Amino acid sequence: MSQHQPPPVFDSTSFLKNVTKLPGVYQMYDADGAILYVGKAKNLKNRLSSYFRATGLTPKTHALVKRIQAIEVTVTPSEAEALVLEHNLIKSQKPPFNILLRDDKSFPYIFISEGEPYPKLAFHRGPKKKKGQYFGPFPNASAVKETLNFLQRTFRVRQCEDSVFRSRTRPCLQYQIGRCTGPCVEAISVEDYAVDLAHTAMFLDGKSEVLQQELQVEMEQASQALDFERAVVVRDQITDLRQVQAQQVMEAGYSNQDVVACASESGVHCIHILYVRQGRIVGSKSYLPKTKLDSTEEDVLSAFLAHHYLGGAAMDVPPHIIISHKLADQLIIGEAVEKATGKQLKLTHNVRTYRAKWLAMALEAARQNLKNHLNNKQTLVARFESLQDILGLDETPNRIECFDISHSSGELTVGSCVVFDQNGAKKSDYRRFNIEGIKAGDDYAAMEQVLTRRYTRLQKESSSMPDLVLIDGGKGQLSKAKAVVEELGIHDMMLIGVAKGTTRKPGFETLVLTSGAERVLKADSAALHLIQQIRDEAHRFAITGHKQRRDKKRRTSVLEGIPGVGPKRRKELLVHFGGLQEVLRANVDDLAKAPSISKKMAQEIYNVLHSE
């Protein structure tokens, strides 16, 4: 009988004899051919030799070296180009021993279109394909929406979609409440609209002082011309601008720059960025990088800067970046960014006056956010460990999935799956399922369909299975879940039903096990709090999905029963009038102006919509 053979030991001596001293990138693989680590080096031979010395390795680096079975190297013309390649490989392959960012979503911008008489103002995220002006980046979507709301109130530039704008025959509600000048019906001239648009762009460029001076002159000219209505409008714009400016920290003479600070505690790191545009702090954002090796704050900051500013066209790179630590590869990072983006970048760690204050703000924010994260993580870990004790498990669950079903009287059923680990919710792994082909209101069949689709997909993709699955329901739902799991041949997955109890109040839940046993937890149980948190999130996610599906159906359901009005005509009506409410308000003559709608059909539509 053959015995299991251990994997062969990597022959580092033979390998290192043939390694070049040129700059480049190296990739380390384990016995299964899976990527372990990606690194760069100015001198590949010296850098790779350092992994195989007899002493001086950190415990985690030693653990990495023990798993190495193969190393591939790629020579590059310079260390800067090695940094660019390293960044791309880390992003695409996600090696487990590299520092990885959790949030890689592109940043939002404000967009002003070009090439039309009445350009629009809009939220934008993603590649900059459309022709126009992009302002940003902003730290998050909320900051963009808050700014758009202010601009709509102050300068009244349109923010509607082009399809709605082109199809309107009368002003919308925004015009009626004084938040739009009505360009869709030419209630404002192209010339006057261009002035409002220019003022909007000046504000977004951070030129508030110059803009206020222009508006002051315009207000005085309007008063002298006895155009008091216009003078009042401009006066209100000046007032709004001054109120916003009073809330900002200003420093004349400084151009656009980012302030990046790194703080660490208990082996966890936090990066915080302040975005300064035209001397004004326009926003901030925190990151919690995953660190697998014994990384210093300098290591983490260096890796972050390379990842962040080589992240593609969605990121605007300012000419100056203030950093909290002096880095050995500061110049290399700047050179790599310049090669990748064509923009010069200067990194500075030694600053004074207002820039020193900005750096202090960023450091304090990093420390505070890190403290909050550690507190939250400790709470989560304690809850996971409590759940382990309650269930008598040998190991703490690492991944928990929870399912819920939502519908209205059995219609438009939606199933949800949420995922938690000891770091909290993994929203990128959340999934929704539109349920079809079951009897209305049959929650058991709905749950069976959701679980079958979910775990058939995970099996097909060879994706990670959860350690524990929570089913929102009692013995009936749990038995369906058990049957699905057994049918799919899945083992080592614990199933638990979460029954709400007779009172259906939080704190009185009963845990139902597949053995038929039940557990009632104390109201102050940390395990119960974790289950409630996950179950409530699954419930929220299911309800949100159901409401979205229901609202989408309602937007067209009123028109579905009209003879001769199929999907194409329904869509044309909604686009022409800008929404269902406008269709309902339209008279027969208005309806007849829509594409493909004759006078006779317009009368038919009107009769159906207004019949009692």
UniProtKB/Swiss-Prot annotation:
Function of the molecule: The UvrABC repair system catalyzes the recognition and processing of DNA lesions. UvrC both incises the 5' and 3' sides of the lesion. The N-terminal half is responsible for the 3' incision and the C-terminal half is responsible for the 5' incision.
Organism: Saccharophagus degradans (strain 2-40 / ATCC 43961 / DSM 17024)
SUPFAM superfamilies in the record: C-terminal UvrC-binding domain of UvrB (SSF46600), GIY-YIG endonuclease (SSF82771), RuvA domain 2-like (SSF47781)
Subunit structure: Interacts with UvrB in an incision complex.
UVR domain segment(s): 209-244
Highest taxon of source: Bacteria
GO BP term, pick one: nucleotide-excision repair
Coiled-coil residue windows: none
GO MF annotations in UniProt: DNA binding; excinuclease ABC activity
Family: Belongs to the UvrC family.
Record's protein name: UvrABC system protein C
